Design a protein with these regions (language model features):
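General structural concept
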Residues: 13-20
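Short coil/turn segments at secondary-structure boundaries
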Residues: 10-12, 119-120
Length: 297
């Protein structure tokens, strides 16, 4: 992040914050595989496509924190990926996925979309990174069969091969403020609807959708949450001397848009911090996932 008076935005993290972060990203990983209550599918042998910006960017914490809880393999390995360019990571990750298969994918909405298009290009032999006959012998038998079936199906349907033709993801997660712009396209490319997360430099990870993919719930152990109505936020921008009222989680109303205000727990440095993000309350309960707490988008 660059701009304003300071070239880099940084935020301090305590060990307790990192422990909470680890627990919550693990919960997100599990939830991303779920289609209904009590149905999960995560194994230590699963493979994870590395499509994240490395440290000091906040996304660089994800593989490190997850590695403390479960030994999922990243493609390519984190130690190698951090020293590669975006294009190099995509090409190597694709080649490794063809050999080992792929179970998970996580990235910022726009970045995930760019990676997906890059994989589609590689799948169809573009960019010099396509699957060559010489490398097929190194692939698992079921991946060779899947590739042959995908080529036949795509030829019959007269279309280009997509990532979903080769990889059957268990879980797909996206974060960022532009997710809504890419969700439909990402679902078409991968054959699975991405689960949206709320994360940022200052708060770490704060919220996630469930198997219903119908709004995010905030993690109660990450921060204390307050909300400013859109009307009051705009008035405050026009008149900086105006102090807007804040509302608590049990005071938000469905359909209303709010600016999020949070106080980081576990020794964080941000108290009643306004990050500028806006969220709409989409409901106070959801029968599908049996919740009675507000959810947002």
């Amino acid at each position: 992040w660059e701009g304003g008076k300071h070239p880099i935005k940084v935020a301090p993290y305590t060990r307790s914050m990192l422990d909470t972060y680890r627990n919550n990203v693990t919960a997100c990983l599990i939830l991303s595989t779920s289609k209904e209550k009590g149905s999960f599918d995560v194994a230590a042998t699963d493979k994870f496509l590395y499509a994240l910006a490395p440290l000091p960017f906040a996304t660089g914490l994800f593989p490190l924190a997850l590695g403390e809880e479960i030994g999922i393999e990243f493609l390519p390995a984190v130690k190698e990926a951090v020293n590669m360019s975006f294009s190099e990571r995509n090409k190597l990750g694709f080649k490794m996925a063809m050999k080992k298969d792929l179970g998970f994918f996580f990235g910022l909405g726009s970045v995930a979309y760019a990676v997906s298009l890059s994989l589609s290009s590689l799948t169809n032999g573009g960019g010099g990174g396509g699957v060559k006959l010489s490398s097929l012998m190194q692939c698992k038998p079921h991946m060779i069969l899947r590739l042959l079936q995908a080529k036949r199906r795509c030829k019959k349907e007269n279309r280009a091969m997509l990532p979903k033709d080769l990889f059957h993801l268990k879980g797909f997660m996206v974060a960022g403020t532009d997710n809504l712009c890419y969700k439909e396209d990402l679902e078409e490319l991968w054959g699975i609807r991405p689960m949206e997360l709320f994360a940022g430099t200052e708060p770490s990870i704060m919220g996630t959708e469930t198997w219903t993919r119908k709004g995010m719930y905030f993690f109660p152990d990450t921060a204390f949450y307050e909300f400013i109505t859109e009307k009051d936020m705009m008035r405050n921008y026009e008149d900086p001397s105006y102090i807007p009222s804040t509302y608590l989680m049990d005071e938000v109303r469905p359909g209303e848009k709010y600016e999020l205000v949070f106080t980081i727990l576990k020794g964080g440095a941000f108290a009643r911090y306004r990050c500028g993000d806006m969220y709409r309350c989409v409901g106070l309960e959801n029968r599908e996932d049996e919740t009675r707490i507000p959810r947002f988008e």
